[in-house]
Design a protein with these regions (language model features):
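Structural core segment of the AMP-binding/adenylate-forming
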Residues: 2, 82, 106, 110-167
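N-terminal presequences and immediately downstream first alpha-helices
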Residues: 1-24, 154-163
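Acyl-group handling in specialized metabolite and lipid biosynthesis
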Residues: 21-31, 55-64
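Conserved AMP-binding/adenylate-forming core of the ANL superfamily
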Residues: 48-106, 123-128
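A short N-terminal helical cap/helix-turn-helix that marks the beginning
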Residues: 2-10, 29-52
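Generic alpha-helical structural signal
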Residues: 32-35, 70, 74, 150
Length: 167
């Protein structure tokens, strides 16, 4: 099942030095988790390994390698930067658990944004409260969720962009 053993075993043998060596991380290093989860794996020569296996409600399966994840997450990060979104900007992910959710999350982290994943079943009031309190600048969503976003737009002065990931 797992090559890491039980939780109890890992607690007994855990050592930060081993983890630092394994991850290539040294105390005080600054890392970008988005880059760390994709680009670093590719640089290690493991780009063709599977990074994500997604299964939809109709049992549709999509598989993505680390190389594909790197390209997709970099594409999102670059697009967000072209919109003049910058490090520290809050960017909401308001969508179902589709592959774009994961690409978007890592892409936001890569460009230095603050990823704000929100439960896609939220209604207008719950969505508004979170977007308003966070001063969210952009929202990445699916077309089917626009009906929840449109009625609250006029009351969200910080929200500059709505990015729809499907047709």
């Amino acid at each position: 099942m797992s090559n890491i053993g039980s939780y109890e075993e890992r607690c007994k043998t855990f050592n930060w030095k081993i983890s630092e060596d394994e991850l290539g991380y040294k105390k005080g290093d600054v890392i970008n988790i988005g880059e760390y989860c994709t680009d670093r794996i590719c640089r290690m020569g493991k780009g063709e390994k599977l990074a994500l296996i997604w299964q939809g409600h109709s049992n549709e399966i999509k598989k993505y390698t680390f190389n594909e994840m790197k390209v997709l997450t970099n594409t999102i990060a670059n697009y967000l930067q072209k919109l003049n979104l910058t490090s520290g900007d809050r960017i909401c992910l308001f969508m179902d658990k589709v592959p774009e959710l994961y690409f978007g999350f890592l892409g936001i982290l890569k460009m230095g944004g603050i990823a704000q994943p929100l439960f896609s079943a939220f209604g207008g009031e719950s969505l508004f409260t979170r977007l308003d309190n966070a001063k969210t600048k952009a929202i990445i969503t699916q077309r089917k969720h626009l009906k929840k976003i449109r009625p609250i737009l006029k009351d969200l002065p910080s929200l500059e962009y709505i990015i729809v990931v499907d047709d």
